[in-house]
């Protein structure tokens, strides 16, 4: 028995030692895929600093399938899930020690299921000023994305520019036949200056947004009214019904300020300030402006970090969003023209989200990182007259881990796991039922039921990369899955499969 134990122990030792020798993951893959990079997501919005993000070149071409399904819609306007197919190419190239370029191109197609009370694209961006009906249904989607940037360093000065473009088409082939076409263009320019120990950066962003939207009915017996929504179940009654041809004009600007340690160790700060506006216009009424949504944002990220063989970051995140909505009071038509009598600010929405974060990890034979987050969020909405209110506040926590290791002589295995919990602290909904469409009251109560619920979130991912011969090419496969469990006894499931090559 002792001899057998010695043989087993010796065998396990040999396997462990062999695995340790071979367990060195691909260094380029690790640099570009490690969870530590999430800490720099805000910093890299300055293209001058994005140009210094990586020391190595990396490109990836992949196809993917994403499946999401909810047992009941948490938000009626977003539906119960989607099936999306995507092909995407990403690249980051070092042209020299002082310059780099990066880019992305993707095409996505698929279907959203069981959408109600929403006949536009980009619901989260434009709500509450949307076109909506009670029937809804599935929608087909197409999206094209093109992004590209360039950065260079001259002496102690870093300069960079970036362009991001999105075109999207969403439509339905049965009544009510909604069709929305979106174009979204963003331009960024940034600079940074190297001092003895810090990088001081500043960047500006300009955005132009447009969406055309219309709803048609092919069967006269199937016509239902399209509502012009104005917030918390309120409806602009005068222009609801047959005003189904709209477009949204919008855009805005943002300013980014950055302070980053040059050697990876020290205090850091990222500040974002921005304003955007989106106007809803009735195309069929001689381009009559109906409403305008203002969105102001301020974001702060500040803390201390140390990177190297051992990574550690402790920092705070805080975000404030103020959304105000103006409605135009319109007079009687005169020669097919509608005079605007006055403009009233009727919708107000304030969002605060603050969290404390810590990230710790090591990069030696393998790379692993653990991230922890604890935060507080409150969302207050108000419609002025007749008064409507919806207030929600919650605390949340999240724990995530990532492990990257070599597997065999040419393989790299990446595993990630995330768990989170969202706990409702306080919630309130007040709607004047007498002055509200019955179906809209039902919709608002449904959404509020899930807005004030508690949620438990679990997600996992596994990815394997395998080198091809002696070249820098590798092929990979990735599988992601997760579930969100709601205290209202409903849940969401998520599954994604991705296959591709890297070089």
What are these regions (language model features)?
Residues 71-78, 114-120, 171-179, 213-220, ...:
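Outer-membrane beta-barrel translocator domains and adjoining extracellular loop/strand segments
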Residues 94-98, 153-157, 194-196, 262-264, ...:
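Outer-membrane beta-barrel channels and translocator barrels
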Residues 116-130, 205-249, 277-290, 332-336:
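Short, flexible helix-coil linker/hinge segments at the edges of structured domains or between repeats
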Residues 27, 491-503:
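Outer-membrane beta-barrel "beta-signal"
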Residues 234-374:
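Long, internal scaffold/assembly segments composed of regular secondary structure
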Residues 63-71, 107-111, 152-156, 165-169, ...:
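Transmembrane beta-strands of outer-membrane beta-barrel pores
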Residues 57-63, 100-105, 157-163, 200-204, ...:
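Transmembrane beta-strands of outer-membrane beta-barrel proteins
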């Amino acid at each position: 028995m002792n001899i057998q134990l010695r043989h087993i122990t010796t065998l396990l030792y040999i396997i462990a030692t062999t695995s340790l020798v071979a367990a060195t993951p691909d260094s380029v893959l690790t640099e570009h895929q490690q969870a530590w990079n999430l800490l720099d997501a805000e910093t890299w919005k300055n293209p001058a600093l994005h140009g210094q993000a990586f020391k190595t070149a990396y490109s990836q071409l992949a196809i993917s399938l994403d499946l999401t399904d909810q047992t009941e819609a948490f938000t009626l306007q977003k539906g119960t899930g989607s099936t999306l197919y995507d092909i995407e190419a990403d690249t980051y190239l070092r042209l020299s020690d002082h310059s780099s370029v990066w880019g992305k191109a993707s095409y996505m197609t698929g279907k959203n299921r069981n959408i109600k009370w929403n006949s536009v694209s980009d619901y989260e961006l434009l709500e509450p000023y949307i076109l909506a009906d009670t029937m809804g249904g599935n929608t087909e989607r197409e999206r094209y994305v093109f992004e590209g940037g360039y950065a260079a360093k001259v002496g102690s000065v870093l300069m960079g520019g970036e362009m991001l473009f999105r075109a999207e088409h969403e439509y339905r082939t049965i009544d009510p036949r909604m069709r929305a076409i979106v174009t979204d263009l963003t331009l960024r320019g940034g600079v940074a200056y190297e001092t003895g120990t810090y990088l001081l950066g500043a960047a500006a962003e300009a955005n132009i947004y447009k969406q055309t939207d219309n709803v048609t009915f092919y069967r006269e017996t199937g016509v239902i009214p399209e509502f012009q929504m104005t917030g918390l179940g309120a409806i602009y009654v005068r222009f609801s019904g047959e005003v189904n041809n709209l477009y949204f004009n919008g855009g805005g600007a943002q300013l980014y300020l950055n302070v980053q340690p040059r050697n990876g160790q020290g205090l850091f700060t990222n500040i974002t300030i921005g304003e955007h506006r989106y106007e809803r216009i009735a195309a069929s009424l001689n381009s009559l402006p109906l409403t305008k949504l203002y969105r102001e944002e301020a974001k702060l990220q500040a803390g201390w970090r140390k990177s190297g063989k051992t990574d550690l970051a402790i920092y705070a995140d805080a975000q404030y969003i103020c959304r105000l909505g103006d409605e135009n009071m319109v007079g009687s038509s005169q020669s097919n023209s509608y005079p605007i009598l006055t403009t009233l600010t009727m919708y107000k929405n304030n969002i605060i989200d603050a969290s404390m974060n810590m990230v710790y990890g090591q990069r030696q034979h393998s790379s692993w990182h653990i991230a922890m987050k604890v935060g507080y969020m409150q969302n207050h909405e108000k419609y002025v007259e007749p008064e409507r209110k919806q207030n929600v506040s919650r605390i949340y926590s999240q724990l995530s881990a990532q492990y990257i290791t070599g597997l065999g002589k040419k393989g790299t295995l990446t595993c990630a796991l995330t768990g989170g919990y969202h706990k409702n602290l306080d919630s309130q909904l007040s709607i004047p039922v007498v002055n509200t469409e019955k179906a809209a009251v039902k919709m608002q109560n449904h959404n509020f039921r899930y807005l004030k619920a508690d949620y438990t979130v679990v997600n996992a991912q596994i990815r394997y990369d395998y080198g091809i011969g002696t070249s820098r090419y590798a092929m990979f496969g990735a599988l992601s899955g997760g579930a969100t469990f709601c205290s209202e006894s409903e849940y969401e499931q998520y599954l994604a499969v991705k296959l591709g090559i890297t070089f």
